[in-house]
Amino acid sequence: MNRRRFLQQAAIAFPLAAAAVRGVSARALDANASVVIVGAGLAGLRTADLLHKAGVPVIVLEARAFPGGRVLTVRAPFDDGLHAEAGPTRFAGAHAAVLRAARAYKLPLVPLAASGADVTAVNGRPASTLQGQRAWMLDLKRDEQMTTPAELLDRYVGELPRELGDPRAPQSAFARWEAYERLTWPEWLRSRGASPDAVRLMTVGGDSSGVSALYVLRQYAMLRASTQRYKIGGGMDRLPGAMAASLSGIIRYNAPVVRVERQSTGFRVDYREGAVRSIAAARVVFAVPASTMRQIEMKPRLSRLKEQAIEQLSYYDGVRFLIQVKRPFWKAAGFSGSARTDRATEIWDAATEQTASSRGILAATTGGEMGRRTLGMTPDASLSLGVDLIADAFPGIRSEFEKGASYRWSTEPWTRGAFALYRPGQMTTLMPVLASAESGLHFAGEHTSIWTGWMEGALESGERAAREVLNATGRSWPEQTGATR
């Protein structure tokens, strides 16, 4: 879900940066901090907020010119003040850390309650009713026929989430879940007796072909009782914006970290801010994706297990399409604007609460093989593909199209992917290693949390990293933070 202004930003050549660092070893440090935090996404901002409130001297180094990481609200090129999300679009009622943060910064919570029928499109044929699904001509077993994808999912998952126990259990409990992640999600559904076409229906809307079954089951279990979804009024980027504003003078933008060296008194952190500059720190918190960690030179190197985990973790090749239309034409036909298709695409009304304009925006996300198809495309060709994908569910978009944008996360230089993608066998092996501290080095980000892929995961991991630092340094947890100690 390549969500950002990165199409206007040039990537800094990391190999050149690393080479330049080697020539500045004798130069004096330009600052000191007890803790340097790498990355001003939600994880880094939350870590910085808690440490700052606890009285810890902190400096945050951010490669981009703005905070938020993968939280990106797009306002251009849309008309009438419309906006849409190129990053996270929603969060759940179960996401306590996001709700706490939004309320702490007095940001408006907008419940998502679109009216109208949802659409599922298979074989290029959209349907919003069970009767309409007959046009799909699928080879389903008798007891699978005339059943919605959600009903099929409930049938084949059954009581299994309860068998998993507490899905929020600490990572030390992963061992008992190993049996659930030996297969991919589609393979696991087939092992439960689902027909191939039933599996196809249960996996519309995304590419789960390489995803660990445990990854999906834990998400399913944690969200099962939480049906309400929210977004932040005025744009999701208001949350990192408010958090960053409260940390004035602490964050340095356009300052990508290129090297971290352990020294006798702590660490030296080298970053580019025009020339290469350095900061001395007692501890370092890496609040960046594993894909970004691969670009930072570590001296000495991290542990073998940590290096392997960072190298092996995959990221979803997500692409986000944001399409402005003359009017929200789907509403007149009784549709909500939400749809899932068998071309690994999820679609939704991105401007449902923005009633000041007569226009509308349909957003769509695709990924996996379909997302990789966009890598060699021009922006216009990518946008055209987005319209085609949405037309599978809402054919009227072709005549209503005005303008739009596409965002390819896998080409964003500071992310290289939409969110962490755990493959079979990796959640029980990689995640505990990725989240563990190493002698003054701490690690945060959605990829280290049970809420992988959500803003909740980023905030939660930031709280964990801050807790590690405070415990290690004997400092007290800051009061009135709303976080769990």
Question: What name fits each language-model region?
Answer:
Residues 2-485:
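FAD-dinucleotide binding site
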